Design a protein with these regions (language model features):
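Gram-negative bacterial Sec-dependent N-terminal signal peptides
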Residues: 2-19
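Predominantly soluble domains enriched in secretory-pathway, periplasmic, or organellar proteins
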Residues: 18-392
Length: 392
């Protein structure tokens, strides 16, 4: 972790780095908690006025500014900013939005941070973004309009709209080596119903839709809601993991080079550990550990995949908060920060950030900065100098 000190600029309410002490800075987008959740606060809190923003928080337990917000990027109160993704060289951050047909793009080389608005008129309920290996194109899933938007990675303008055969695209993964993009079919955005059961393969170079694969062993309609998907870095043959949000299972999609197609199979059932709502997927640097969050109850689950990716071995389930969702990992892979909130849903919106010592496999602290102000964090990533991509 970088050694710096912080000088408070009182008039601007900002803090700026110079030489002296430790810090790890994270980007955390947030929104006000639900009206029902806000009733629990006995005293007035800022979140009671509908707000959104991206907070830059010092998450280093060794820092004198631990838990402090050192900078804020304001966002419209009706944007419903959802995820934050870095492009391949981590020069820009892309922020998706559930409430507007827009992307926010942040130039990470300039402080204080500002967000450029990019209109994506064909995209309703923007979810996930991935980038081609050459950083020249981005791919955005749109759960409300059932589209995949392909954009220019330099100008950030949309250049192609792909209509998908399966509705409600959410999770997305790309593998340039086999020229494939995989997209999940999740749920109807308006009411979280009509759950999907497929993933769809698209030719990455052209945007041509190729095939769809059912990732459930139940009779249709299975209602399993595949939500996230991610390729294991460096795996040969290529293999991607899929989390089924409502089905409570983990599946694999393994590339069959002879058929130029994917074989899908169930890899793990979270019901065996009395966990549900599996969400995000991450890997360690060696790609022999798989991390999966489960929102109910909130846990960070660690699997050994060194022997057989098709049969991940659960090593430990580390308690986090209700709604355990996104995870940020430090470059040295010593610490993980688990953001605990899912769509402001009851029972899955704790609002804290759990700090996990990955070497010990235990919780060492919690950051309640946003929670205590009546906000829920929706995503977390560390700034590039501290961030491990964890397969993303």
């Amino acid at each position: 972790m970088k050694r710096i000190c912080v000088i408070a600029v009182m008039g601007a309410g900002l803090m700026w780095p110079c030489a002296g002490s430790a810090e790890i800075l994270a980007l955390v987008n947030y929104e006000s908690k639900s009206e029902e959740a806000l009733k629990a606060f006995r005293s007035p809190v800022p979140g009671q006025r509908r707000q959104e923003g991206i907070a830059v928080i010092d998450v280093d337990p060794a820092s004198p500014n631990f838990k402090k917000i050192v900078e804020t990027i304001p966002l419209p109160a009706d944007l419903v900013a959802h995820h934050i993704f870095y492009n391949r060289d981590s020069s820009k951050a892309y922020v998706t939005a559930l409430g507007k047909a827009e992307l926010r793009v942040i130039d990470l080389s300039k402080r204080p941070f500002t967000a450029k608005t990019v209109a994506v008129p064909d995209c309703q309920v923007g979810e996930d973004v991935v980038f081609s290996a050459d950083n020249k194109r981005w791919f955005l899933t749109c759960m409300g309009s059932s589209k995949l938007i392909i954009g220019d990675g330099v100008t950030d303008q949309p250049i192609q709209t792909v209509s998908l055969p399966q509705p409600y695209p959410h999770g997305i993964a790309i593998h340039d080596g086999i020229d494939r993009v995989l997209v999940t079919s999740t749920v109807r955005a308006t009411d979280l119903k009509d759950a999907g059961e497929h993933i769809t393969a698209i030719e990455a170079s052209t945007g041509k839709v190729l095939s769809s694969y059912k990732v459930s062993s139940k009779p249709s309609p299975a209602g399993d809601a595949p939500v996230e998907i991610l390729f294991v870095p460096g795996a040969n043959p290529p293999v991607a993991y899929v989390t089924n949000m409502f089905g409570g299972t983990l599946w694999t999609a393994t590339w069959n080079a002879q058929k130029k197609d994917f074989d899908v199979a169930q890899a793990f059932d979270f019901a065996t550990i009395k966990a549900g709502v599996p969400l995000e997927i991450y890997f360690n640097g060696k790609s022999d550990r798989l991390y999966v969050t489960t929102a109910k109850p909130g846990h960070l689950n660690i699997f050994d995949i060194s022997k057989n990716a098709a049969k991940p071995e659960l090593l430990k389930s580390i308690p986090a908060g209700e709604g355990a969702h996104h995870v940020a990992v430090t470059k040295d892979e010593k610490l993980a920060f688990v953001q605990n909130s899912l769509l402001n849903l009851p029972g899955m919106s704790d609002g804290s950030i759990t700090i996990v010592d990955l070497a010990k496999g235990e919780v060492i602290g919690s950051i309640d900065t946003l929670k205590d102000q009546g906000f829920n964090p929706n995503c977390i990533v560390l700034l590039p100098q501290w961030n491990h991509p964890a397969g993303h």
